């Protein structure tokens, strides 16, 4: 942007000038736009070929996508930039409560040990079986996505949530001994038919799966609500609940509703043998 004398202004100077003019009722968009000029970015190192970018976008928007409706989601090798799969999946997300306070703790080394311990054991619990299709870490959250065409497989993911909940109890007892702050987590589990596509830049080596549907989104949202606002640590979607066996259904709370989550159920379940071992002092020889 230039001033009335034709001099190029910095961003701060331009904003100050606009504010001063707006104070004099200089508010119409046309008048403001007249005072803008395009800056020459030719000397900037970063380059983006926007003409080629337009062609790439149009190629993607006009390309055919071969969508296969499958019971069981195949492994990554079969997913390409030109196909997609539609299948039943169940996602589990484990999110640390009050992580902002935790990460601003002055003792960075203790926080790093805590986070490494947390992620290590969540991954150990989730990274099991042939049904896992994606596992990862998003900030302070660990997640896993499973192909679950059978009810028994959905129950297995629910069991993982209970193991995670019990493991946090073990972790906190160990943290107390090391004089490191304890943590609370929210655990979200959700099931749905999901469309999975491969996204990224073909040929760049930068790509990942994108999950389109309710399972992953809801599980992530639910993990953010667990152990918060009177919710218990484990929150599951209504569809996940409907696919639990009768024993697991009987362990859940009554049906709840939230504008962000829709209908859901929560619980604070633990694995009894694991919990007994914790309560007995976590002795290695027992």
From Swiss-Prot:
Superkingdom of the organism of origin: Bacteria
Residues the record lists as binding a ribonucleoside 5'-triphosphate: 93
Binding positions for Mn(2+) 2 per the UniProt entry: 95-96, 140
Record keyword Manganese present: yes
Molecular function (Gene Ontology), one example: adenylate cyclase activity
EC number, as in UniProt: 4.6.1.26
Residues that coordinate or bind Mn(2+) 1: 95, 140
Cofactor(s) required for function per UniProt: Mn(2+)
Keywords, sorted A to Z: Antiviral defense, Cytoplasm, Lyase, Manganese, Metal-binding, Nucleotide-binding
Pfam family, one: Guanylate_cyc
Domain Guanylate cyclase: 90-223
Entry annotated with the keyword Nucleotidyltransferase: no
Catalytic activity: UTP = 3',5'-cyclic UMP + diphosphate
InterPro entries (alphabetical): A/G_cyclase (IPR001054), Nucleotide_cyclase (IPR029787)
Signal sequence segment: none
GO cellular component: cytoplasm
Annotated coiled-coil segments of the chain: none
Protein location: Cytoplasm
Role this protein plays: Pycsar (pyrimidine cyclase system for antiphage resistance) provides immunity against bacteriophage. The pyrimidine cyclase (PycC) synthesizes cyclic nucleotides in response to infection; these serve as specific second messenger signals. The signals activate the adjacent effector, leading to bacterial cell death and abortive phage infection. A clade C Pycsar system. The pyrimidine cyclase gene of a two-gene Pycsar system, weakly generates cyclic UMP (cUMP) from UTP, has little to no activity on ATP, CTP or GTP. Expression of this and adjacent effector TpPycTM (AC A0A1T4LJG1) probably confers resistance to bacteriophage. The genes are probably only expressed in response to bacteriophage infection.
Subunit structure, interactors included: Homodimer.
Protein family (similarity comment): Belongs to the adenylyl cyclase class-4/guanylyl cyclase family. Pyrimidine cyclase subfamily.
Full protein name: Uridylate cyclase
Source organism (scientific name): Treponema porcinum
